[in-house]
């Protein structure tokens, strides 16, 4: 009577059983399905967009671009990060489920680039806001360099241990928006002294005509370099009128003099 055992049992069993740990299985599943959140603020994002085409085909690495941070575990910062965009970047990173990773793409993201010398609104390094796992220099980096950065990130994910990942999550690795406010001293509210607001102006001692009379009291004509500011409306209305200033002996006609600025 023949045996009921399969003749191929001894040949297929060693090749169909894999001995592994739960940690390695989790790492393998995560590195094979990295879902990136595209955070492009400048020209570096154009190079990443070229990966979607058939020439590079980044789908072979399991990358599926997502528009929501709650469905992504990888954020790629491509371009300049300004002070105004920094809170939104931190907020997006906080909304991503852990474990999460960051790739800093381009010189402007890593160090601020050409804007880091004299710009008051550029963040000089995105690692001051969120933790960075892979730095990708270039201005801009080529698509082949982006693929190399993804491969390096996959190797990092494959070597991770659950205990180490838990310790990193407990520590303060990045800037957070969960500030703790404290009660400070009372500030100056701007209640000015009413006496200063309603203070009447000091009366003028002499009028303009009196000043002119004293100035040209001893002369019979006005100097040629005497000028007048003529950009006001009153000058346009009264340019054809005659102005007289009474002196001690005669009247001086101001119309014959050319008024210029």
Swiss-Prot record:
Binds 1 [4Fe-4S] cluster. [4Fe-4S] cluster binds at residues 43-44, 108, 139. It comes from Cycas taitungensis (Prince sago). It is a peripheral membrane protein. Its EC number is 7.1.1.-. It comes from the Eukaryota. PROSITE patterns: COMPLEX1_20K. One of its GO terms (biological process) is aerobic respiration. This is NAD(P)H-quinone oxidoreductase subunit K, chloroplastic. NDH is composed of at least 16 different subunits, 5 of which are encoded in the nucleus. HAMAP family: NDH1_NuoB (MF_01356). The keyword Transmembrane does not apply. The gene is ndhK. InterPro entries: NADH_UbQ_OxRdtase-like_20kDa, NADH_UQ_OxRdtase_20Kd_su. Belongs to the complex I 20 kDa subunit family. NDH shuttles electrons from NAD(P)H:plastoquinone, via FMN and iron-sulfur (Fe-S) centers, to quinones in the photosynthetic chain and possibly in a chloroplast respiratory chain. The immediate electron acceptor for the enzyme in this species is believed to be plastoquinone. Couples the redox reaction to proton translocation, and thus conserves the redox energy in a proton gradient. The keyword Cell membrane does not apply. It catalyses: a plastoquinone + NADH + (n+1) H(+)(in) = a plastoquinol + NAD(+) + n H(+)(out); a plastoquinone + NADPH + (n+1) H(+)(in) = a plastoquinol + NADP(+) + n H(+)(out). It is found in: Plastid, Chloroplast thylakoid membrane. One of its GO terms (molecular function) is 4 iron, 4 sulfur cluster binding. Its cofactor is [4Fe-4S] cluster. Pfam families: Oxidored_q6. Keywords: 4Fe-4S, Chloroplast, Iron, Iron-sulfur, Membrane, Metal-binding, NAD, NADP, Plastid, Plastoquinone, Quinone, Thylakoid, Translocase, Transport. It is an enzyme of class 7 (translocase). GO terms for cellular component: chloroplast thylakoid membrane; respiratory chain complex I.
């Amino acid at each position: 009577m023949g045996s009921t055992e399969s003749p191929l049992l001894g040949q297929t069993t060693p090749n169909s059983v894999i001995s592994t740990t739960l940690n390695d299985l989790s790492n393998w599943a995560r590195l094979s399905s990295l879902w990136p959140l595209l955070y492009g603020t400048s020209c570096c994002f154009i190079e990443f967009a070229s990966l979607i085409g058939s020439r590079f085909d980044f789908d072979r690495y399991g990358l599926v671009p997502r528009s929501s941070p709650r469905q992504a575990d990888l954020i790629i910062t491509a371009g300049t990060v300004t002070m105004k965009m920094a809170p939104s970047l931190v907020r997006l990173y906080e909304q991503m489920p852990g474990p999460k990773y960051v790739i800093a793409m381009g010189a402007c993201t890593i160090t601020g680039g050409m804007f880091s010398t004299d710009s008051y609104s550029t963040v000089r390094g995105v690692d001051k806001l969120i933790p960075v796992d892979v730095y990708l220099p270039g201005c801009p980096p080529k698509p082949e360099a982006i693929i190399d950065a993804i491969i390096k990130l996959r190797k990092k994910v494959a070597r991770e241990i659950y205990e180490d990942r838990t310790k990193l999550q407990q520590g303060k690795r990045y800037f957070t928006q969960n500030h703790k406010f404290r009660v400070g001293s009372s500030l100056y509210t701007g209640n000015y002294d009413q006496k200063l607001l309603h203070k009447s102006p000091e009366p003028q001692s002499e009028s303009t005509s009196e000043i002119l009379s004293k100035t040209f009291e001893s002369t019979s004509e006005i100097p040629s370099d005497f000028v007048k500011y003529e950009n006001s409306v009153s000058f346009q209305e009264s340019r054809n009128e005659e102005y007289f200033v009474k002196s001690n002996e005669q009247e001086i006609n101001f119309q014959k003099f050319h008024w210029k600025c």
